[in-house]
């Protein structure tokens, strides 16, 4: 399918990026929800979170279109809002796990931590795919260590 033929179905580039972003958002939320749904202890969170980060990184490395979608969302205010809403939704899955693990913790603090960890993860992935592969791998490993230290803190 050529780019020109896409414009038969979409009025402009923004509409194409929006449709791709919505599709990716739905698929990623289903994956994240499934991965975190059964987590009941710190070890399970560590494993599930690490696997999700690795999947996300591999996806960005394997699918250049993901980079294009991200670039397109950054260039458009409405698309940035879509991405922000997606990030909040994904952070809610993480918050649910944190609440199960720390039922007496301040819920607002857990929400803030989950949202910030999620946003930092997205930034870490973008940085990792912008540098040489070996450095990107190190950055992703460092992010996982830092994020898990915060998520698993008592």
Language model: regions and residue ranges:
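An amphipathic alpha-helix signature
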Residues: 46, 50, 54, 88-95, ...
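Helix-turn-helix
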Residues: 1-15
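Hydrophobic/aromatic-rich alpha-helical bundle segments in the mid-to-C-terminal region
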Residues: 71-72, 80, 100-146
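Hydrophobic alpha-helical bundle segments that form small-molecule/ligand-binding pockets
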Residues: 37-42, 62-68, 73-77, 88-114, ...
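Hydrophobic alpha-helical connector segments
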Residues: 15, 19, 23, 33-61, ...
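Short, structured helix-loop boundary elements
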Residues: 14, 18, 42, 46-50, ...
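Non-catalytic cap/lid and distal C-terminal segments of serine-dependent acyl enzymes
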Residues: 82, 88, 92, 96, ...
């Amino acid at each position: 399918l050529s780019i020109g033929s896409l414009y038969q179905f979409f009025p402009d580039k923004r509409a194409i990026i929006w449709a791709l972003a919505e599709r990716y958002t739905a698929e990623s939320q289903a994956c994240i929800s499934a991965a975190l749904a059964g987590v009941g202890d710190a070890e399970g969170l560590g494993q599930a979170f690490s696997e999700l980060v690795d999947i996300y990184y591999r996806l960005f490395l394997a699918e250049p279109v993901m980079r294009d979608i991200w670039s397109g969302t950054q260039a458009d205010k409405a698309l940035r809002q879509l991405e922000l809403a997606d990030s909040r939704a994904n952070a809610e899955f993480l918050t649910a796990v944190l609440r199960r693990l720390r039922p007496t913790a301040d819920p607002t603090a857990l929400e803030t931590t989950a949202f910030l960890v999620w946003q930092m993860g997205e930034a870490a992935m973008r940085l990792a795919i912008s540098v040489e592969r070996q450095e990107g791998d190190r950055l992703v490993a460092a992010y996982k260590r830092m994020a898990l230290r915060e998520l698993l803190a008592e």
